[in-house]
Amino acid sequence: MDVTKKNKRDGTEVTERIVTETVTTRLTSLPPKGGTSNGYAKTASLGGGSRLEKQSLTHGSSGYINSTGSTRGHASTSSYRRAHSPASTLPNSPGSTFERKTHVTRHAYEGSSSGNSSPEYPRKEFASSSTRGRSQTRESEIRVRLQSASPSTRWTELDDVKRLLKGSRSASVSPTRNSSNTLPIPKKGTVETKIVTASSQSVSGTYDATILDANLPSHVWSSTLPAGSSMGTYHNNMTTQSSSLLNTNAYSAGSVFGVPNNMASCSPTLHPGLSTSSSVFGMQNNLAPSLTTLSHGTTTTSTAYGVKKNMPQSPAAVNTGVSTSAACTTSVQSDDLLHKDCKFLILEKDNTPAKKEMELLIMTKDSGKVFTASPASIAATSFSEDTLKKEKQAAYNADSGLKAEANGDLKTVSTKGKTTTADIHSYGSSGGGGSGGGGGVGGAGGGPWGPAPAWCPCGSCCSWWKWLLGLLLTWLLLLGLLFGLIALAEEVRKLKARVDELERIRRSILPYGDSMDRIEKDRLQGMAPAAGADLDKIGLHSDSQEELWMFVRKKLMMEQENGNLRGSPGPKGDMGSPGPKGDRGFPGTPGIPGPLGHPGPQGPKGQKGSVGDPGMEGPMGQRGREGPMGPRGEAGPPGSGEKGERGAAGEPGPHGPPGVPGSVGPKGSSGSPGPQGPPGPVGLQGLRGEVGLPGVKGDKGPMGPPGPKGDQGEKGPRGLTGEPGMRGLPGAVGEPGAKGAMGPAGPDGHQGPRGEQGLTGMPGIRGPPGPSGDPGKPGLTGPQGPQGLPGTPGRPGIKGEPGAPGKIVTSEGSSMLTVPGPPGPPGAMGPPGPPGAPGPAGPAGLPGHQEVLNLQGPPGPPGPRGPPGPSIPGPPGPRGPPGEGLPGPPGPPGSFLSNSETFLSGPPGPPGPPGPKGDQGPPGPRGHQGEQGLPGFSTSGSSSFGLNLQGPPGPPGPQGPKGDKGDPGVPGALGIPSGPSEGGSSSTMYVSGPPGPPGPPGPPGSISSSGQEIQQYISEYMQSDSIRSYLSGVQGPPGPPGPPGPVTTITGETFDYSELASHVVSYLRTSGYGVSLFSSSISSEDILAVLQRDDVRQYLRQYLMGPRGPPGPPGASGDGSLLSLDYAELSSRILSYMSSSGISIGLPGPPGPPGLPGTSYEELLSLLRGSEFRGIVGPPGPPGPPGIPGNVWSSISVEDLSSYLHTAGLSFIPGPPGPPGPPGPRGPPGVSGALATYAAENSDSFRSELISYLTSPDVRSFIVGPPGPPGPQGPPGDSRLLSTDASHSRGSSSSSHSSSVRRGSSYSSSMSTGGGGAGSLGAGGAFGEAAGDRGPYGTDIGPGGGYGAAAEGGMYAGNGGLLGADFAGDLDYNELAVRVSESMQRQGLLQGMAYTVQGPPGQPGPQGPPGISKVFSAYSNVTADLMDFFQTYGAIQGPPGQKGEMGTPGPKGDRGPAGPPGHPGPPGPRGHKGEKGDKGDQVYAGRRRRRSIAVKP
């Protein structure tokens, strides 16, 4: 029956199973559970029947008890003998692995249990059928098996052993970890597979390899495991480890198969000795180490194969008894364990003369010996069998011991001379059984000396002289101790005598002291004189103490009189004594314990980090081979060099030339690398250009082979560069083409934004006349965005979806490809894009939406705003021609992006999608416009961030239908040049530009439509769920803050509407957007008046108030705030105001959407991460709350919206802050592709640009103002407009910020102004203070409203706290109007249209910035500020929100890390994808490592 005991060892529960012979358990498949497990079972008593043999203990050696553990018999047999039962049997042994079947796994193999359990060695059985009989025959069989198992007959051959040790898996790793002696046994032996019957169980031990019965095989840990550890179970090694493993046995002998060895050494402790033994099979080895306990053993040594080696090295001392034996003898108990199981064959060449003791085959494991796992308890010293039994306990477990002893002596017979069978008789068998010793020695069977005492653990292998020697040594040791004690006692005695003497002296002196005291006392009392006289007379002549004291007293008195006695202070000196303590310093040496470091292994986890580096490794490159990577490859130029070898691929490059159309030229220069790169690079681009066909070539061998280099290959892309790219554009869906168009535009746009815009602006101005002249130019412009947006219900937006092609961006910047996705939505707008003409207005679009209405007709003229218009041009699509022209400008922005913002790519992107659609293409152009608007226009490069926001306008896309005119989209194709934005290949990101959505505005293109129409359209559009979702979505995030409403201003100041209005007006004027045209008719007063209208004000308040709540937290819900504002309403109001003023703003706004595509948040993040601002990125994360707005992001990023609004001029209301803020984040994305590369390649330049952008009044104002709101405060939810702004900002900011930050701090950085805005608002304002003091933002901002002050204190900074100071008050509609006007002007957002309304959305923008704003609190040194801020606060993260935010971006963030792989940095654009790839690679590498690791274990 099985009895199972459960012990807890080391906290683990071990179950020992004692199997009654009845059952055998098959460990077979698993490593034993038993105690080994822990190692120490300390106790383990096995209980077992009989005897119990607790063995146990064994240190917990886990010997496990084993003890008989075995089973059944345990009882009977007396344990140890039982031992053969294997109790020892390593119970733990790996039983595991080995069949051990029995064993029950439990420690003990149970050893024999099973029939074998008989005291004899059933073990011998090895395969043991159930038979216990360990007949010699069986031994012979086993030997035969072992031999047959090995290739050579002697598997013990040294070579085999070496081989095993070397690589072998051969088990046991350990390869003899221990002493060298043990050799591992070849694994093969093990196979045998013979199945041992379960019954054989005992066998189990049989490790003998042979057996190992099939089950084992399964385990057979054997090798494999690394030593010791290896399974825990695995003894082996055990070795010290042993401990665990428990020793044991661990080795369990064996590693299987032999080799457990090593064990030995096992810690001694572990007593194991064990270890040793192990040797497995044959190796007797070990054995001994037994070592008693102590260390002992260890030794173990055991030689392997038959080498007896072993001898116990163990210190004999200990336990001596135990140790020894080495020989088979059980010797060490633990040994025996192994033996038992292992039955070591000595193998040593089978031929070896039996004489070697080792030789004892001990074939059976049992050897009876010891079974005891014995580990030794120390004590163990040998015990006689009986003694053992008794001793066992005494030994406490030590007993382990020997117990095995015997087993009756193993007597070993020399069989084959080499093996001896040891019959073990029961204990009773009389210790000698004669066998023991004789067998032991020389295996001569009798051995001249006769058997060793039955109780001798290694009785069969020890000679009498060995025992004698052991005893002698022991006695010597004892004598040494005795003498030492005697000497000590003598010393103590002397010390005592000395002490007594001192005590006596002290006592004798005390009396004198007393006497003296009395005398002095008397003298002092006047008695002294007489005494003095006496002393004088007496002098010292008298010997009496009294006289002496008198003399002394007199002397003292004199001294005292003389004041000489004053020495008293001296006492302090005593303190010095402590000094000695200093010596203790030495203890410091204990540091040595450091070794515990072993736990270090866990360190591997750290490896994961290292894995990151691997990501960089070529493997990733391979992925690069993948088509996708190839595209990224473009950035690869450097890589291309290598690929250049692939000259062949270069051929594809030729194809590229067509694509080159111009842009190729630039890359052509890169071409030089191209030659090399051409093959690969070209191939890559080819893919893009061809849209697959070329790509194919790219994929061709060149890329594949280079795969690893793939990264470089990416650089190769330059080679592809224009050529393939061009082609790809056309070939590809054309999307690439679209981007291409953008690209060209990008360059123009770049300039355009600045100069052109100005010019355009003029035209824009004309726009006003346009109304008059509507028939004339205005008409054209009109077509563009302004009306378009309203015009197109946005249904076209659906078409816009094609905009998605924006992805084409890929062609431009593979990295950005992803970004395109977002544009996709705008893409829908794309179809409308043709009408793109309105596109120009697009920029203003988002914000414009509301304003757009006003701008409507007039906007046409704003169209001129060409610069932005350019982006808008796409929308103007109708104009087709103009659209193209415009797109050109956008291109510039693209380039601009390349320089500072990824924006560049964005514009191209939009065209790209349109390109394919052709019709839509036009929208694409518009998309550009939109982007431009973002880049804006006022922001020009910086606006680029804004572009993203444009995405929101996407909704207008519906109008897009008119967009069909989109033909201009073709110009978009020019985008290809965007290549120029190389640095900003990210521009591809912009491909998002596809946002075609803006295109929709195109429909409105009919500038003719009156401002009313536009207004209505915008209003509808704005109000429409689609647009709202965009606007709100983006801005929304900030919205949440709304709740805090209380804060009137971010700064906490009341919002000054006058300030705002003036701001708006000035903005409109500064923007030079048709504002001036209209501005004549519009004045800040006008806007103010409009804003102040109760209905307007109420409207603003209702939305803004809530938002107002600085509560940045609400920011999370930011969407809500944004949503809360009815931009349509606001825009309609403002527009109506404007229109009433005679201001008609184009609908340019719509184009804005393209911007959205801009960079993806991830891209932005990547870019930022790569940039010095990377700190910013992380921090932004905090705005977790904004995450909510994130939804909006899905289609449009807050940044996108913000930028869109920004470009549209929408931002003004929110106060400049809003729009910009969001854009900021987006911007980075825009930049991400280009920026990332750009930043990487031109970090300084980029930084300068970024800073300049951020510092630009427009951006700053946007960035700065809004951020304030985010400030925590605001809970009160005042309904100040500003508060709205603030809350909105805050929400927005928060959201935006988080977004932006999340999106990319880079933008955020710029936005940081936004944060700054908060600061400005927060001059004293909640945000500034609350945030300032409180939050990282606050901190930055905190001082002086931080941002606000630094930023001129105004949301717009220019106003210097306009928002800050002004916002504090209730919304001052005048202020608001002014601000809106100014903002719009400044941004040029209103150029096309004055969507003041959008302004509100803008607010959210600011929030985005906050994260960064701090950093930029002073534009003068944004970088420094950012650095300081981050260093000081890590602040950006500081915002608790961060985690939330970060979480969302986080994933992408991870890629960011991949960014490092970014090394390809230049390839950066590709880098993004590459990063992903890298990541994969990393993982891959990680896996490899893991795999390796797995193997090692």
Curated annotation (Swiss-Prot):
Residues 57-96, 169-183 have a biased composition (Polar residues). The keyword Secreted applies. It comes from the Eukaryota. Residues 489-1497 are extracellular. Residues 1-154, 167-186, 562-1011, 1209-1234, 1261-1316, 1434-1497 are annotated as: Disordered. Keywords: Basement membrane, Cell junction, Collagen, Disease variant, Disulfide bond, Epidermolysis bullosa, Extracellular matrix, Glycoprotein, Hydroxylation, Membrane, Phosphoprotein, Repeat, Secreted, Signal-anchor, Transmembrane, Transmembrane helix. Pfam families: Collagen (PF01391). Its main location: other. One of its GO terms (biological process) is cell-matrix adhesion. It is a single-pass type II membrane protein. Residues 145-230 are annotated as: Necessary for interaction with DST and for the recruitment of DST to hemidesmosome. May play a role in the integrity of hemidesmosome and the attachment of basal keratinocytes to the underlying basement membrane. The 120 kDa linear IgA disease antigen is an anchoring filament component involved in dermal-epidermal cohesion. Is the target of linear IgA bullous dermatosis autoantibodies. It is linked to Epidermolysis bullosa, junctional 4, intermediate: A form of epidermolysis bullosa, a genodermatosis characterized by recurrent blistering, fragility of the skin and mucosal epithelia, and erosions caused by minor mechanical trauma. JEB4 is an autosomal recessive, intermediate form in which blistering lesions occur between the epidermis and the dermis at the lamina lucida level of the basement membrane zone. Epithelial recurrent erosion dystrophy: A corneal dystrophy characterized by recurrent episodes of epithelial erosions from childhood, with occasional impairment of vision. Most patients have attacks of redness, photophobia, epiphora, and ocular pain. Exposure to sunlight or draught, dust and smoke and lack of sleep can precipitate attacks. Both the 120 kDa linear IgA disease antigen and the 97 kDa linear IgA disease antigen of COL17A1, represent major antigenic targets of autoantibodies in patients with linear IgA disease (LAD). LAD is a subepidermal blistering disorder characterized by tissue-bound and circulating IgA autoantibodies to the dermal-epidermal junction. These IgA autoantibodies preferentially react with 97 and the 120 kDa forms, but not with the full-length COL17A1, suggesting that the cleavage of the ectodomain generates novel autoantigenic epitopes. This is Collagen alpha-1(XVII) chain. It comes from Homo sapiens. The lineage of its organism: Eukaryota, Metazoa, Chordata, Craniata, Vertebrata.
